[in-house]
Amino acid sequence: MREAIKCISEYVQCPISMAAQCVIGAISHIAQRNVNAPHPYVKDGEPCSLFLLSEGQSGSRKSSAKTIADHSIKEYERLQYDRYRRNDRQWQKKFLGNEKKEHKSCLAETKEPKDPSSVFSDITIESLLGLYIDGFVTNVSISSDEAAQFFAGHTMKSETRNQALATFTKLFDDGYVERTRSKSNLNGSGRAYDVRLTFNLQGQREVLIKALQDPVLRGQGFLARFILTVPENLAGQRFQDKEHQSKDINTDSRMIIYWERCSDLLNDSSDHQRYVIPLDEEAKKVDLAFYNEIESLQAKGKCYEYLQAFASRASQLARRLATVFTYFQGEAFINKQILLAACDVIRFSLNEWLRYTEIELDKESDAEKLIKNLKLKNGSKK
């Protein structure tokens, strides 16, 4: 996985952190189907699904990096959808070929095929709830290199935004959704347990900065669940030579190994319930130390004093990320090295969030200065 990240960054000429987010988003989508992260108090663990957010200007190569990281998932989705279309055509032919009175028995004998699509770039909360509750999907990714589709979309602009945010946080925490409707409503009531959602969003600062400083999105804890990266813009430094142009990422062993591993995990047809990947004894020590480290930095006067909603989730996010890494590597336990790497990613993310908090505080300070100046001017005129 580490080599695949380096490979993407090298060929695409994008920052390592951007390539890493793309790969993490892909393997979170794959891992959430089969494993749970360890939880301090819950025997069955918690979802290992991750919420990821990357800022990148137009031309930062974020789309190219994401396309490469998602290659195996897209191929898998395409093959599954082609199979569904074939089965659906056969089913429709059989169903419509029967007399109307035989439709009920036909439905009992052969169920209508379900669209297996599980990766969406743009989907409303109502549509998503419907897919979960009706049993069409259990594992979904909202994945887009145009974050505006989500943050400026219907769900985040509608009157029910707060309800949608509560649903997303419940999905993240418990893998559970519910919908309560009147009997006359076509979109009926229902619940879905053990469902999963990964967010992998990328966008430009002009789009993201409004969302990331939105007091509702921050206050409800929605954004606090995201791992954020705001990489340096490499424009003006991405020079190429003949050697670079002659290389082919499709024949690079680093990518082939990564893509094959993704495909193997996606095609794993083992019929089993999700299982928890536990921490080994050394990893437990790392988990404890990391928790106490971040807790101490939330004290008054410390760097995360005004970032407590985000910092308080650091240990949880590190365990989830380590679970995803461990599953991808085929290990039975989360070891010390894997958890240390996950902790480094979460520290990096917290510092990225801190930068946005500082931008907001600077704006408030400027506003306060303006008010003071106006008051002074008005006072001098009297």
Model-derived features: where do they sit?
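Phosphate-handling catalytic cores of nucleic-acid transaction enzymes
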Residues: 1-382
